[in-house]
Amino acid sequence: MDKIIIKGARENNLKNIDLEIPKNKLVVITGVSGSGKSSLAFDTIFAEGKRRYFESLSSYARQFLGGNDKADVESIEGLSPTIAVDQKSTNQNPRSIVGTITEIYDYLRVLFARVGTPFCPNGHGQIKSQTPKQIADFLFSLSPKSKIQILAPIEIKKGYKINDVLNNLRNQGYLRVLVNNEVYQLDENLPQFLDNKKTDVAIIVDRLILNIDHQTKTRALDAIEFALNYSGGEIAFKVNDDIHYFTQNDVCQVCGFKIKEIEPTLFSFNSPIGACEQCKGLGYNYVPDERKMIPNPNLSINEGGLDYFKNTVNTTNLDWQRFNSIIKHYKIDKTKPLKELDRKEIDLLLYGSDEAIEIDITSANNKKYSSIDYVEGVLELVNRRYQETSSELAREHYNKYMSEKVCKSCKGKKLSSQALSVLINKINIIDFIEKNIDEAIDFLLHLDLNEAQTKIANPILKEVLDRLGFLKNVGLEYLTLARPASSLSGGEAQRIRLATQIGSKLTGILYVLDEPSIGLHQRDNDKLINTLKEMRDLGNTVIVVEHDEETMLAADYLIDIGPQAGVNGGYVIAAGTPQEVMQNPNSLTGQYLSKQKDILVPKTRRSGNGHKVILKGAKHNNLKNVDLTIPLGKFICVTGVSGSGKSSLILETLVKAIEYTNFNPFVIPGEYKDLIGASNVDKIVVVNQDAIGRTTRSNPATYVGVFDDIRTVFENTIEAKARGYSKSRFSFNIKGGRCERCWGDGTIRIEMHFLPDVYISCEECHGKRYNDETLQVKFKGKSIYDVLKMPIDEALVFFENYPGIHRKLQLLVDVGLGYLELGASSTSLSGGEAQRIKLAKFLQRKPTGKTLFVLDEPTTGLHIDDVAKLIKILDKIVDGGDTVLVIEHNLDLIKVADYIIDIGPEGGNKGGKIIATGTPEQLLSKKDISYTAQYLEKYLKKN
């Protein structure tokens, strides 16, 4: 069968649709936000494919895979095995890096274990082990008649007493030992050796005068074999007065630096064998931060300059009294601003006394106690409490004084010194993974290996280079293999999974992808489209939910779902080739693709309010000492290829620098020299795509504050007044009006212990969250539950006579969310929906003319028509006098900006510079160095 035939799909808002999708083609599903694209692609096609696969497994296997409900569809024919590559489930494990999730690091561990060469980290050259034959050859090369002692070195392990070790050797029957080059008879009284001093101990296995006769050789070889076995591969010869050390292990002959057996586990930072002992393989330690302890050095101790003691200074608090002993003993002035104290005094306050001092304590019943002891400083106190506490609440309190600091032992490289001493072509494994993908490919292609090493390395190199090539082909060449997985955007994580799938070379698979172009610059879009076509050409069906114009035009088959969102969507409006969809007068997507509809370029650009914020010398991550000027009162767009440094400059440095300067001294911005004009900003609003709440109790109505107003309306109904119900009666979070069986959740969680928890609708309230008495109170014939189930569009009309409610709902409609239910669970919302809800909340405030709005890729998940609505909202903010700063790749949004800041020219180490600034028209003069300018020119002409 060459088609997937879907009949009667009714999942979510789908309207009983019938659809035929050609197999082994690149199929794009598009439509306005909330129209039903994901309901068709993920909740119907993928869900049914997964369910059928699970049903083919044994009942024993299925019990570990959780519930897989049948999609609400009559039938699907021609379905292949399905794989979803979405933007969810980004790994938050701090130990996961790009190298581990792509499995490239596993191959590298084998490569370094088999081909790497150990070198002494103290500069003593290559570390070589010797074979027993080489050791014996050295012995027999000595001058005849030489006096030889064959020694088995003993390692005195930590915690063991030297005399106890020697007594144990005596009990084993040994006669003589060499201790610090002195011979001792074990059957005589031994001196008491100091355990805290470095002591070299060796058993004298044999003493002989070197001859070349057979008997002497045999005796010497037996002694060598015994010494090597006893000492774990170590041996020494005392020749006259000189000692010569040899080893079968990897040990430096000069300084004794020893390497464990070189196996792949030595290079794993998740294994105790390879991980740095101090940071346990994380590369950083969590330690108290002086900047957080002294957020305002203009304050004195009495004024709360030491933040931890600000509420207990000069009280009977025991911690304070003990700490105050330092202040008394060293006569530190508590009334002086901390910035006027000398460094020694600050160190005493932070790190404590380096001598025992007098401590005076007065108890609650006024008894006085004195003692003499060392006193810990405030940072040491916080660190100890943080490590010792088992209370999450206390840990959270101490947490605000802590920061991640690079591990001093491994310098952030995560591995032990033994692992880091193994090199290939002068670099260790961490040096290699800190290269970006392009640099890594170049390094591997130019490896200098001998014939034997090449034979071992070739199959490993093929696997690594293939995977690196796939990452490059999906536009991720700027990433390093050491990049933490938790720092990846949804789009980056998805494209990494995409690269992994290409590497599998599977055929006959149905892939379902969710907006793979997110976060991708237009320059890299062609690479992504070629990757999708490559997957198709392997004999797979590739279904992509996408809004990107280039991807839609590259599709073999385009499906437009609509016409609108929510209850007004769920229909197949058009299906066919992109050209056929463009010719369909009912298709909104077709109208935009054919340019019958368009987002118009403004005739004039705003000149701003004349004020600026200037950031100087930004060096965070890959930023190259950047000076940034933000003209206020404008719509500003920050552009640049993926990984060029946009987020590092704006979110990590500029935003945090303004927050640190104006609002929150606990925020730690990226490195910069100076910030000028921060006083021109009285509020900074970052609108990101994080969820609006962590539980099902959060919803759009509660987040924007309209639910309080709606509950007030119900409180004022005649029925509610007659029953004496207050506003709180209509809350599903408070006892009284809510259903007590499910505590207002509407669902009940059934714990399955070893299986995933199961959620069922509450039998008492039938999922309505409230008890019957509360639901009997009606407003215009609707209960509070009915109102929460309303789409926002419908609620807007329902509450048209209530200006406060109407205004808040109108803002949600304005940002394109009219299709959402008022009570939609926050956990069911996409990142783009969450971002627009936040925007609607902030738009309730009156413009101050000094607010800076910062949005990170706000067009994520938006159809072209929704982008047009978003632009109207952003224009409204700027027209009110405030400033909008957007990090964006979408050219429809970039072309309407007043001012563009383009960062590049490339990603990673080749980026980090501002290469062009100005209006879109001014940017075109830099198209020789700016990729954004090149595509913007085409786009402006096209539009």
From Swiss-Prot:
SUPFAM superfamilies: P-loop containing nucleoside triphosphate hydrolases (SSF52540)
Residues at which ATP binds: 31-38, 640-647
Pfam family, one: UvrA_DNA-bind
Annotated ranges, domain ABC transporter: 309-588, 608-937
Zinc finger (C4-type): 252-279, 739-765
Keywords: ATP-binding, Cytoplasm, DNA damage, DNA excision, DNA repair, DNA-binding, Excision nuclease, Metal-binding, Nucleotide-binding, Repeat, SOS response, Zinc, Zinc-finger
Principal location class: cytoplasm
Keyword Hydrolase (UniProt): no
InterPro entries, A to Z: ABC_transporter-like_ATP-bd, ABC_transporter-like_CS, ATP_grasp_subdomain_1, P-loop_NTPase, UvrA, UvrA_DNA-bd, UvrA_inter
Family annotation (CDD domains): ABC_UvrA_II (cd03271)
Location of the protein in the cell: Cytoplasm
Record GO cellular component, one term: cytoplasm
GO BP term, pick one: nucleotide-excision repair
GO molecular function: ATP binding; ATP hydrolysis activity; DNA binding; excinuclease ABC activity; zinc ion binding
Assembly information from the UniProt record: Forms a heterotetramer with UvrB during the search for lesions.
Similarity annotation: Belongs to the ABC transporter superfamily. UvrA family.
HAMAP family associated with the record: UvrA
Summary of the function given for this chain in its UniProt record: The UvrABC repair system catalyzes the recognition and processing of DNA lesions. UvrA is an ATPase and a DNA-binding protein. A damage recognition complex composed of 2 UvrA and 2 UvrB subunits scans DNA for abnormalities. When the presence of a lesion has been verified by UvrB, the UvrA molecules dissociate.
Protein's name according to its UniProt entry: UvrABC system protein A
Source species: Ureaplasma parvum serovar 3 (strain ATCC 700970)
Gene: uvrA
